[in-house]
Amino acid sequence: MEPAEDLQKVFDKAFAGMREAREAFAPSLAPREVGTITSIATGIAKVSGLPGVGFDELVKFPGDLFGIAFNVDEAEIGVVLLGEYWHLHAGDEVDRTGRVMDVAVGDGLLGRVIDPLGRPLDGRGPVASSHRLPIERPASPIMDRAPVTVPLQTGLKVIDALIPVGRGQRELILGDRQTGKTAIAIDTILNQQGQNVLCVYCAIGQRASAVAKVVATLREKGAMDFTTVVVTEGNDPPGLAYIAPYAATSIAEHFMEAGRDVLIVYDDLTQHARAYRELSLLLRRPPGREAFPGDIFYIHSRLLERATHLRQERGGGSLTALPIIETQAQNISAYIPTNLISITDGQIYLSPSLFELGVLPAVDVGKSVSRVGGKAQRTAYRAVAGDLKLAYAQFEELETFARFGARLDENTTKIIEHGRRIRACLKQPESAPVSVAAQIAVLLALSAELFDGVELNQMTEAEQAVRAAAADMPAEVRARFDSADKLSDEDREAIIQIARVALASFQPAPEPETAPKTKTDIKPKPKAAGGESS
């Protein structure tokens, strides 16, 4: 065979292979929809040329920056930017993604500090997660929900006894600036240690120093092991502040749908409402009351309706929400506070006047309520909570009259003195949750008026003595705290006796009885000088 023929066969074979590969290759041509930035403002961009984009669709900008299509008009699209946008310019290209905003979920987020996009902020590397959920999800239908029947212990005596919270409830915390709203939420998270409850703390528009303090407290107390922290700082774009609570709720819902109990704290929704107002005004949406857009109620209702208690057929998990709201000059009838009060299942109001008096937590029992938590409250609490709340309400009413200097009868004075000791017992330092057994021992001692003989300046030490003595409570009595059984009279008397012994050293010593005078003890009156007149 000639060398030329061999070479020809080699070429023929090679070309035949190329033809087969070319015929087997089917190029997948997909249309790419590209738009153009027309203008940029604070936290938003106007984009033209994306006719197929959908509402809430994620769009991609240069530099791996994403945004959400918020206004969808024929002429242009208003996009909320989810990150730093200083590098963007008019004329830059914008791509559709065909998907909505989602966030990483799963056990890999426990113990981590992330932003609403799922990016780590704690310097511990990427978040380990293989599953993602959209940040906007429909709330569970009514047929999938179960009544709130299990208590969520906060570790705070005034709340667990008088304003109980149940798993699956939405309880609003509201008050003026610097009255301890965040402290109540953090104490509640700390008390979930050992309770098989996972926690999500969502900081919206907070100072970096305040968030760092919260994270340090959670780490110090060992609570970060079961907590995820979602953070947007005050200098972040408003778009991140807007999506933060929705992303945090999706993280919590993943655990709830797996049959677990979850607590989520929104700190605070005032900043969320302001961020949404800023975005709406920039996007030229019509303003309403206090310049908020007309759907401000809807953005909070659709968020908080996702908190619920699922039926056992759906896993039996629960999501308890503690939204925080800030009031101005104690005005709880303002627009956003009244919206949240009507959406939630109750509220805990913190009074600046109580805070100034040193009553911490500064819970105003008269203005606070729990609409569904009472059904979930432990039976042991119910035996004393009703009488205690009535006595405290009577005290607050009478104390107002006592300030005017009115003369009070003995019964009124007794009610006021008893109420002052109730208020002193309900005081509690920050980051110091109290166990159920210790709380019930203190409450029973209050109902039995064992503290009434204790001086007010000794109430803190006396209350601590009762809590310490509660550790000696019989195990069978402790077991009944977690059951639906009522405390028997013998159990109540045993607990009261433990408290009575603990308070013995704080009671005033009885005054010695004086013997009655006899006739021999009576001395005759001395005669006047000069004797009797004749």
From Swiss-Prot:
Per the record, membrane topology reads: Peripheral membrane protein
Q: Which domain of life is it from?
A: Bacteria
Compartment annotation: Cell inner membrane
A single GO cellular-component term from the record reads: proton-transporting ATP synthase complex
Chief location of this protein? membrane
Annotated residues for binding of ATP: 175-182
- Cite the residue spans of the region called Disordered: 506-534
Instruction: Give the compositionally biased regions (Basic and acidic residues).
Output: 514-524
What does the record give under GO molecular function? ADP binding; ATP binding; proton-transporting ATP synthase activity, rotational mechanism
Disulphide-bonded residues: none
**PANTHER family recorded:** ATP SYNTHASE SUBUNIT ALPHA, MITOCHONDRIAL
Q: NCBIfam families recorded for this chain?
A: alt_F1F0_F1_al (TIGR03324), atpA (TIGR00962), PRK13343.1 (NF009884)
Complexes and interactors:
F-type ATPases have 2 components, CF(1) - the catalytic core - and CF(0) - the membrane proton channel. CF(1) has five subunits: alpha(3), beta(3), gamma(1), delta(1), epsilon(1). CF(0) has three main subunits: a(1), b(2) and c(9-12). The alpha and beta chains form an alternating ring which encloses part of the gamma chain. CF(1) is attached to CF(0) by a central stalk formed by the gamma and epsilon chains, while a peripheral stalk is formed by the delta and b chains.
What function does this protein fulfil?
Answer: Produces ATP from ADP in the presence of a proton gradient across the membrane. The alpha chain is a regulatory subunit.
The record's similarity note reads:
Belongs to the ATPase alpha/beta chains family.
Instruction: State the name under which the record lists this protein.
Output: ATP synthase subunit alpha 2
Q: What is the species listed in this Swiss-Prot or TrEMBL entry?
A: Albidiferax ferrireducens (strain ATCC BAA-621 / DSM 15236 / T118)
Gene symbol of the encoding locus: atpA2
